[in-house]
């Protein structure tokens, strides 16, 4: 059933691999001096300083430096600390930290001070922190009012589905090394019975999941919308073809962090669900959960008014509140546009022909605000740089370019940020780091500076990176790939220490599949590790274990909950902040 993996049953047995490192020597200064921002001369122009050899052989006594001996030493700082080898190492490391800080936060004093505070708070965490780390965090409680005037949606409730129901089957899943058990469709299973410190659920949804999205809310009850493809298959239709058919969107409810159940199911005839995204505001109406943007394989974007308590469990959506599409292209992705001031009523979409379109839902015009060429091929992702740069947007496409543009003038203020040798399937914006998290060469997760000055490696895999997720409450990046593994990484461990410091990769779980036995095995309890230095090979994994989407919960008090959707139909939601550790 796949390669054996090293496991640990007790999460409290985690150890920090860098306990023996001299990390305490690298301390960021509060104010940068002129010496800190000077560029050092190459090491070959410096005068070599003799040091004491720490070997069993006969020691060599080092001579103290004199003012005359320090002449011609290039641009080395002329301070008392620089007269010793240890002091010089500290100074060089400090400059490396300041350089990385400037690459991420720029030269503005306020941004630099904010970055220093965040680094000091988060740089010591190698795994997901406990719930106490999220206390004091604030969330955006903007109200959803402007979209409540829409009244074009038609819902049909029925007790018995007059159409065909999806043919779903039980999945044989073994958790850890226990014997396999049959998981029935839409029946949550608690895989952490033997470990009361952890909290989470595993569900057989019965559909090949492709998108998950948490509902923004300020209440204790959480809602999760999940959607998937039309059928279970290793191959799918071309993304440039319009396809339609009966599909469903499931809505799951999490109550008091202990009860997870299916609330209701929305049926539609729009084909495979490519993307689900809730409007990032809170509804003021008790009868409405929120507005859900849905991109399907028929090439259209729809906005659904999701009711809080429908009359029946099965609901068929005959017509949406808002439908947007083109005749000459397919809509491939979307994102809600959050303005600096005012309510949210605009949606930015990417198309299969490389065009971008901005649509105002409240506008009486039937055409978008702009429809401009931007990429040379299918646009796969559109991301807004919230909260510090709400006017900037990032896009990735099948032309292997990552571009950035200003929505206030997208025709002039746009430029390519990077060009990769392979398609970038996912990209996300980390506001705490003020940097871009994306995949490179299919297998690597990298940090790209918004200013285009540096790139740092976060994680490497044997499979293609499919999905990345960030949170506004913590800096941890969730990574999902075709190898069936979900990991989280703390990028602040790269900024808070020296150049040699690497970020620990914490494997949350690993899904394996046996074709011979037609059963799955889900492993967890892994110890955080450092990324491998050797070059990794690309493997072809069974399509059933591919993790198509990971999503952090963006609500206050639930920021540690992570949802993962897999191609075999398994949905896993887990509270990674349940264990208090550091």
Swiss-Prot record:
Matches recorded under PANTHER family: GENERAL TRANSCRIPTION FACTOR 3C POLYPEPTIDE 2, RNA POLYMERASE III TRANSCRIPTION INITIATION FACTOR COMPLEX SUBUNIT
Highest rank taxon of the organism: Eukaryota
WD repeat extents: 221-262, 268-314, 326-369
SUPFAM superfamilies from the UniProt entry: WD40 repeat-like (SSF50978)
InterPro entries with a match to the protein in the record: GTF3C_component, WD40/YVTN_repeat-like_dom_sf, WD40_repeat_dom_sf
Entry keywords, A to Z: DNA-binding, Nucleus, Repeat, Transcription, Transcription regulation, WD repeat
Disordered: region residues: 1-97
Protein name: Transcription factor tau subunit sfc6
Name of the gene: sfc6
Subunit relationships: Component of the TFIIIC complex including sfc1, sfc3, sfc4, sfc6 and sfc7. The subunits are organized in two globular domains, tauA and tauB, connected by a proteolysis-sensitive and flexible linker. Interacts with sfc1, sfc3 and sfc4.
Acidic residues composition bias: residue spans: 18-39
GO cellular component, one term: nucleus
Gene Ontology biological process terms from the UniProt entry: transcription by RNA polymerase III; transcription initiation at RNA polymerase III promoter
GO MF term set: RNA polymerase III general transcription initiation factor activity; tDNA binding
Cellular localisation: Nucleus
Function of the molecule: TFIIIC mediates tRNA and 5S RNA gene activation by binding to intragenic promoter elements. Upstream of the transcription start site, TFIIIC assembles the initiation complex TFIIIB-TFIIIC-tDNA, which is sufficient for RNA polymerase III recruitment and function. Part of the tauB domain of TFIIIC that binds boxB DNA promoter sites of tRNA and similar genes. Cooperates with sfc3 in DNA binding. Localizes to chromatin insulator sequence without recruiting RNA polymerase III and plays a role in nuclear organization.
SS bond partners: none
Biased composition (Polar residues): 63-87
